[in-house]
Amino acid sequence: MQHLDNLLNEAVANNDLPFVVAMVGTAAGVSYSGAAGSGAGPDTVFRVFSFSKAIGAMAAMILIERGKLSLDSRVVDILPEFGNLQVLQGFDGGRPCLRAPKVQATVRHLATHTSGLEYEFWNADIARYVGMTAHPGMLTGLKAALHYPMASDPGTRWGYGMGIDWLGLVVEAVDGRRIDAFCQQEIFDPLGMTSTGFEVDPARLAGMAIRGEDGRFAPFNLAPPSRPEVYGMGHALYSTAPDYLRFLRMILKKGVLDGNRVLAKASVAVMQADQMQGLLFQKMMSAVPLITADFDPFPGTRVTHSFGFLRNEADIPGRRAAGSLGWAGICNTHYWIDPARDVAAVFMAQSLPFAEGRVMRAFENFERAVYARFVRPA
C-alpha cells in the first residue's frame, strides 16, 4: 500500500499531475484506495468524459439482451436523420467534398469506433471542416453537434469519435426514456453508483488544470453543459473513483454486483470480445496539441476494440494480461479491467493535455506496481 501511495505522491511532487485519485479492486472487493495532492479525494466528482463510453455501450447491450436491438441493427433504421451524414473526401478550393457512405453504419460500428465518425481533436480533416463551417462543437450539448461528416466509410477503419453519442440516441429511440433516466434506473441505481450522473453538484467537482508552455499547471475548465438539448452518452458523465470502480468490478463479476444482476454473463462476454471484424486500433494522432498528445497505449501490440472497450490481444509484460479492457477520459482519467488476473483499477486526474508522456509514465508506473504487489502470477 505504501509503495502505491509513494508513487502517487511522486507524480504530484514531480508536477506530472496536479492531483490524482487511484483505486484497485477485484471481484471480491476494493484492494487499494489512495490520493495525492490537495485537489481531490475519494468523494470528489470528476469530469470523466470518455469513461462515459463504456456505460453507453452497456446501455445498448441491455437492450440487445432484451431483444430490442442487435449488434447489426442499422442506425438509419432507428434514427432516420443518421442517413443525412456524408463522408468527407477532402477539400476543393476551400470547399469540403462530401459523398454518401458506401455502407450504412450499425450499432456494432458505433460501439467500436468503426462508424467513420471521428473527433476533430484527432483528425486534421475534420478539424479543418469544423473550422471552415463553424460546426457546433461537441460540448455545446446541441443535437446538431453530432452531425459531423464521416471521415471514412463505416466498417473500413478504426477512428476515435462520437459513435457512442449516437448510440445514446439509439437507446433513447428504442427504449423511450431519455438516456439519463435509462442509465439511472438500469445501471447507476442497481450498481450503487450514487455519485454518477449527467449533472453535477459544483461543490463536489474537482478543479481542473492545463499545462502551459512553461510546464506549470494553470486553472482551466472543460466540461459538458448543464441541461443540454441532448446528453452526450460518449462524454457527458460525472463520476467518482469509488463509483466507477463499482462498474469495473461488475464487469469482473460477469454482470452482477452485491447481488444485483444488471447484465447476463453472455452479454458481458459479448462486451468483452473483439468486435472489430478484422480491423485494428490505430494510433491517435493529435490535431490539437494543446488538448491532447498522440495516443498509442501499447506500441507494437495487436489492439482491437470490444463492444465499448479497448482490448489488448497480447500480454503487456509486467502489466495487464491479454484480453484486458480499458480506456480513458480526455482530462487524464484512466482505467483498466483484467478479467484473466481478476483486477481492475482507476487512475484519475483532471489535467490537459491528455496522454502527455509524463502522465502516461505515471499511470504505467502505477499499473506495474499494482501487478507487482497485488496480482497473482499468471
Describe these PLM feature segments.
Residues 229-237, 324-336, 350-355:
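Glycine-rich phosphate/pyrophosphate-binding beta-alpha loops
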Residues 4, 48-52, 56, 163, ...:
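Hydrophobic (often cysteine-bearing) scaffold residues that line and stabilize catalytic clefts
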Residues 1-49, 68-70, 84-92, 96, ...:
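Short, conserved catalytic-motif segment at the N-terminal edge
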Residues 29-30, 77-322:
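Short, surface-exposed loop or secondary-structure junction motifs
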Residues 351-378:
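Generic C-terminus detector
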Residues 12, 64-65, 146, 252:
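Alpha-helix C-terminal capping/helix-coil junction sites
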Residues 31-34, 335-336, 342-351:
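Short, well-ordered beta-strand elements
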Residues 5-9, 22, 28, 47-75, ...:
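Active-site SXXK
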